Regions:
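A conserved ligand/cofactor-binding region detector
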Residues: 1-268
């Protein structure tokens, strides 16, 4: 609903206010399509909104957005302060909520999974509607993991394909062919990693899959620094992306060379 914040200054002091992105008069079209998303043992309904975007030569692209009907903008007070634990009301309020405390960091995990799960379900639904065979998903869809925020789409898509009768090994192959990853930082220490405890609490259905992916990655390299789950029980999202996508690049050619030659050289 809101961007990071609307910035203003008064008497030399910064003031932070909500920055509305979606309003009652926006072009986002509410649909009847909802997808179930399980978070911390509770099932939420992610509603699909469609936003038409003018495309090349007068054609139209569609931006698919997801929201919860229970979101309540009135819980925001004193600038951009809100209860970060009230997931029903806050989950899609702010883009990248403040993660300076544990509640904010967990909220980011909630947000990321809501979007990738609903998005993956939409992709598979559209695939089925067009007569696409799930085994050939990579011929139908391309999923670009833009920075590490959507990384959970890898285990989630494997999970969804498993529900549709596809064995783990083939699901991994399908997802790897379907997904590509763009890395946005040249500092290895800045790459997103989550304490396993967060994922155990918020998305326990993904952890068995992430464990299997980690075990598979370890058969490819003995370098512990390239593992998905490290010795401190942190899950490295970028490592999972690199191991289980078909392509990794930086945001520019020079950026890609830096990643290859230094920060991510072990993978190259």
């Amino acid at each position: 609903h809101f961007g990071l914040f609307h910035q203003s200054f008064k008497d030399g002091v910064q003031n932070e206010l909500p920055d509305p992105w979606l309003t009652a008069h926006s072009w986002a079209e509410k649909t009847d399509t909802v997808y179930p998303v399980e978070l911390a043992g509770k099932t939420y309904s992610a509603r699909l909104y469609k936003l038409a975007v003018t495309g090349y030569e007068g054609r139209t692209n569609t931006l698919n957005l997801f929201d919860l009907d229970t979101i309540d903008e009135s819980i925001v007070h004193d600038g951009i302060t809100f209860d970060k634990t009230d997931i029903d009301k806050n989950l899609t309020l702010f883009l990248y909520p403040d993660d300076s405390d544990e509640a904010g960091r967990r909220l980011r995990v909630y947000q990321q999974y809501l979007m990738v799960s609903a998005g993956a379900q939409l992709i598979l639904a559209e695939c089925a509607a067009r007569g696409c065979d799930y085994h050939d998903l990579a011929d139908y869809a391309a999923i670009q993991i833009n920075d590490t925020h959507p990384s959970m789409v890898i285990p989630e898509l494997i999970r969804l394909l498993g529900e549709r009768g596809i064995e783990f090994e083939e699901a991994v192959e399908i997802v790897t062919k379907t997904c590509a990853y763009t890395n946005h930082t040249i500092l290895a220490e800045a790459l997103e990693k989550w304490p396993r405890a967060y994922l155990d609490a918020v998305v326990p259905q993904l952890m068995p899959i992430i464990e299997k992916l980690d075990a598979l990655a370890r058969t490819r390299t003995k370098d512990e620094s390239l593992a998905i789950i490290d010795k401190d029980d942190r899950v490295h999202m970028a490592h999972m992306d690199i191991h289980f996508t078909h392509s990794t690049n930086g945001v520019a050619a020079l950026h890609t060379e830096i990643l290859k030659n230094s920060e991510l050289h072990g993978f190259y």
